[in-house]
Amino acid sequence: MTSTSPKSRKPSTKTTKSKSKSKSKSKAAKAAAASASPALARTPPQFRNRVVDKKALKQLVAWAYKTHGTAVTASMADNLKDLGFRYATQAAVSISVEDLKVPEAKQDLLCQAEAQITATEECYRLGEITEVERHTKVIDTWTETNERLVDAVKKNFNQNDPLNSVWMMANSGARGNMSQVRQLVGMRGLMANPQGEIIDLPIRTNFREGLTVTEYVISSYGARKGLVDTALRTADSGYLTRRLVDVAQDVIVREDDCGTTRGIIVKVEDGGFGSRLVGRLTADQVVNVDGEILAERNTEIDPPLSKRFEKAAITEVMVRSPLTCEANRSVCRKCYGWALAHNELADLGEAVGIIAAQSIGEPGTQLTMRTFHTGGVSTAETGVVRSTVAGTVEFGPKARVRGYRTPHGLEAQQSEVDFTLTVKPSGKGRAQRIDITTGSLLFVSDGQEIEADVTVVQIASVAVKKSVEKATKDVICDLAGQVRYEQVIQPREVKDRQGNITLKAQRLGRLWVLAGDVYNLPPNAEPVVQGNVKVERGQVLAEASQASEFGGEVRLRDSIGDSREVQIVTTSMTMKDFKLLGESTHSGELWHLEAKEGTRYRLNTIPGSKIGNGEVVAELADDRFRTQTGGLVRFAPGLAIKKARSAKNGFEVNKGGTLLWIPQETHEINKDISLLMIEDGQWIEAGTEVVKDIFSQTAGIVTVTQKNDILREIIVRSGSFHLCAETKALERFRGDGQIVNPGETIAKGINSEAMVFVQTEDTPEGTGLLLRPVEEYTIPNEAHLPELTHVKQPKGPHLGIKATQRLAFKDGELIKSVEGVELLKTQLILETFDTTPQMTVDVEAVRDKRAKTIERLRLVILESILVRRDTISDSSHGSTHTELQIEDGQSVKASDVVATTQILCKQEGIAQLPVPQEGDPVRRLIVERDEDTITVTTKGSPLVGVGQRLVDGDSLAKDEPSSCCGEVEEVEGKAITLRLGRPYMVSPDSVLHVRDGDLVQRGDGLALLVFERQKTGDIVQGLPRIEELLEARRPRESAVLCKKPGTVEIKQGEDDESITVTVIEADDAIGEYPILLGRNVMVSNGQQVHAGELLTDGPINPHELLDCFFEDLRGRKPLMDAAQEAIAKLQHRLVTEVQNVYKSQGVSIDDKHIEVIVRQMTSKVRIEDAGDTTLLPGELIELRQVEDTNQAMAITGGAPSEFTPVLLGITKASLNTDSFISAASFQETTRVLTEAAIEGKSDWLRGLKENVIIGRLIPAGTGFSGFQEELRAEAGPHPDILAEDPAGYRRMQNLRPDYTVDMPAAPAASSTAVLADPSAADLEATRSRHGIDPAASNFAAFVRPTGENELEEEQLPDPSALEGLQQEGLLTEE
């Protein structure tokens, strides 16, 4: 497979070899290569008989690439592909249903799981575990069964049918994976519901056997969730990538070596370094135990060297890292190490920031695809250790353990320190030693005798720390009865911010519900039986009565269906001098009220409807106040209105008077001006066509309003027009005009006979006065109120009618209209003088008592009482029986009883009343029936007492276990009476919904269990977790961190609840940390703690952690060192956390990518005190910049600035970048640009983004300016031939900077050279002379600059370069 033709065995066709080797080195290499190649060609091909799966294929391709370069690898991969397809075709590999073979072990595994789950349910029934623990155990049981089934599937295929198509496909990694094959031939497994909670009913079948209907529905849940998640996560992942690119886009390799002596320490993990050292440079000598130097400083570590370190048992290596690189605003080649694309030092100008961002962001999309193939939960990543010998357990003197309850409800112990546990055999043999790590769970105790193959310990995994979230689960009652607390629970009342009181359990314990028949009592029902009294079936237990609130006349509606409504008329009012008349129109019924004198009121409601306070009952139908057209309103002195205007009804008249009306006709047109048929200011007669199809109704002067050639309005003002030359008169009436009384002189020869409104008008005939008629309307002081008859109960609500006059318009208002308007409305308004806002009044039509033909309007207020109907026994209310105590038409007084309801007993038993709570009436009562108790007669003497609670299996007498759960009610001789019950376990901090002694119905909530669940270790949580880390989010309830190192002392508060952890520091200072309830303390008395160590469990706040590190170091070190060290500690932590999330998903990302991002997040500090520098307090500045400023201050003797390091999330870091163009293109564009403008910022265009936006060459790769400068410096000064050349050799712009040539000073008249098309041979010669790789496309690969500025002679440009080019035919003379 690996034999290739001798021709393709050139040592390497790699394009980018470093020139930084010295001359002697390169000559030696050439010699070696020359000697190696003939031998290489003669090596016979080696054949290896081995299965090549995905992993082996990866290694093969990597080896080929490394030893033979790209071209050979590509052709080899092609040959392999052809080989594979050819044999697959010949073997006819395809998949049929027959290939899906279900392992025989499946049935046994399912039976075992069922048995385990039955046992778990039994534990829950006996109150040994909580609902949450039951759920967790069920889910873990199924998950474990699933895993074992996968193993069975693998084993089945491997042993019985290794060439099965499905197995080959999944096993080779060609397509699909085991989790999918498992669903085809194992079981589909657990599914999650749309809320993301796992349904504890798994899908036991697989797709080969077929799903039941229920399973199919559940399966679709999971599948849908997978699809939706994928869609959402793709978007999330893309956004994460965008933010990462934004924060790191200006990180470019700009220097060869920054010269730093700092580095980071990489420690051995799982017995080796793996690939974590490969591609890095050592920051210090690496010396083995014997003092032999294995690697000097700045040595590139390749895989063989890494292996050598491992062999020499080296535990940690200090390597250079982007985190500690001191290059300004970039990283240097030595700190960055290899560019992983071609496993060599990164080139200058390589945009490593963007590569890092894409490397971290890209797996996000992949990871999301793995959401639900695995069916929800990942198994616990913990190692269980079983005993290998039978014997005695010894913990040893170092051990420190504390009690712990596992998620499955098992009692265990958790180790607080690392120690070694020994199992000493009872007979002969070697003792078993087990290393216990902190946090491991021990299922045995010190000195315990155990058998072989017993679970001893569950070792805590140091894998990814999954983030936890608080979740709740309800405990629902399965039977009706009375609640009893166990003493252990110790409920306490907790007040929240709103002042609501909740009851919480403090300790783990049980709530009991003792069986009985519970009756819910209706409101205002009172028990009529005493406690502990025997009651018979059908006996009245409680009675409720319903009374009238106000009293009045009773109306009984005919019992329509089950509605039992009793109405009582409490207040009524009849309008006795109005007849009620109704008429039918096509738009519905119209009702009128007619008075004796003939005035009519329009009714605004209809009989049978309801109206509320302040609503209009009727309106006077009166045409006296109706105008012919629109016009202008003027109030004569004396007429007064209320200021406020109600939206619909206009202004209420306070005092009557005269209203003056000046009519004017307004046509609103909104048509083109060309349709106008008259002129502005023209006098027209009534009936004139003013615009096509629109006629004037009155005679008068026309005013035309137009805008942008659109005709808006035409106003016709009627009256008589008089030309006038008297200036004084014209001025007097110009503008708003004036009202002139009869007999007054208006101007010379113009007198008013009636009241007129005079205005000065300019018309085509000339200026004059327009005398407009004024109409007068007299408004009375008060409206007429009809006579009413009242009937009212003493306590009942009041009813009244108020007559009001309302004006539609205020003084000076102009009404634009052609039709007339109603100026005054007289309305009858309902008034109820009652406190209840929701009270409504019924409108009724009644016959007059004397004249039966006449109908009158009556308004009534009804009190409606709903009477309960009889129910035959229902489960919670018992049987009820209701009796009415009144008849139709009867008159009742306030608080008279209308109906009584009795609650009847369903089964005989002993009635009991609950203990009433303060202020709470009795809402329920319980009858303890014969079937709720059981009497057991024991053989021996009883071992139990009255009041004791027992569960199945507890001893009643010697060797006589109880067969049920309950409370002992009495013991007489050997007869024990038990009241049946059911225990429910509640965990600490659960919210209790019931109090001791309360009565509950089946289905009531007893408690709300609060628990922490791990956010599933699925990347569904992985992406948000990475986002949380990179955005440096502050967790809601973070862990308490130790601020200064010292010794721990734990103090209990007086109330036995609050805990305070005190840390006695080195200088005997005491740090106090109060611990909130419900928090687990992670330290023990006398333990030594460091700064930043966790005192309680919970997520860590990274900002707080940085402060802890910095504050601690600041006391012992100079400011700069403290900041650098604190940042380094945090950086290490962040890199590890991000790596853990990806590793848990099996995604490998090189550390350096994460380091580049983390470096950007931690590069800034906040100035606290500026000292004598020009910095501002609160400003965010690069650490390097502050360092330089403070060094300058040290030289000049000024006060340096004080600062604290800050951690910025990626979004914040992007917005705080030096380049405002880049920040503005990311988010909050306006804010960023305005701030930059106000501060007068400059953008130095250092990054890629800002250059792309402005349209310049990006400073990476070939556009990297530093690169060009360096080459120019090597080549010596050259004039730019293109800059001074007007003829323009544009094609020479494609040449690289190291391609510039010396121009000899030519005489003025001399001819200039012009580029000719070179022949292939010429090009070859030129390329070889300038060191250009022929494999690269047109001059695309260029020589890498050297490190030590050593150049081989043949690389230097020839002083007579121009002549050389001419001789080669590249330049011709014209």
Swiss-Prot record:
Zn(2+) binds at C258, C325, C332, C335. Binds 1 Zn(2+) ion per subunit. One of its GO terms (biological process) is DNA-templated transcription. Residues 29-45, 1362-1374 have a biased composition (Low complexity). Pfam families: RNA_pol_Rpb1_3 (PF04983), RNA_pol_Rpb1_4 (PF05000), RNA_pol_Rpb1_5 (PF04998). Its EC number is 2.7.7.6. GO terms for molecular function: DNA binding; DNA-directed RNA polymerase activity; zinc ion binding. It catalyses: RNA(n) + a ribonucleoside 5'-triphosphate = RNA(n+1) + diphosphate. Its cofactor is Zn(2+). Keywords: DNA-directed RNA polymerase, Metal-binding, Nucleotidyltransferase, Transcription, Transferase, Zinc. The keyword Transferase applies. It comes from the Bacteria. Residues 1-47, 1343-1374 are annotated as: Disordered. One of its GO terms (cellular component) is DNA-directed RNA polymerase complex. InterPro entries: DNA-dir_RpoC2_beta_pp (IPR012756), DNA-dir_RpoC_beta_prime (IPR045867), RNA_pol_Rpb1_3 (IPR007066), RNA_pol_Rpb1_3_sf (IPR042102), RNA_pol_Rpb1_4 (IPR007083), RNA_pol_Rpb1_5 (IPR007081), Rpb1_funnel_sf (IPR038120). Residues 7-28 have a biased composition (Basic residues). DNA-dependent RNA polymerase catalyzes the transcription of DNA into RNA using the four ribonucleoside triphosphates as substrates. Belongs to the RNA polymerase beta' chain family. RpoC2 subfamily. In cyanobacteria the RNAP catalytic core is composed of 2 alpha, 1 beta, 1 beta', 1 gamma and 1 omega subunit. When a sigma factor is associated with the core the holoenzyme is formed, which can initiate transcription. This is DNA-directed RNA polymerase subunit beta'. It comes from Prochlorococcus marinus (strain MIT 9303).
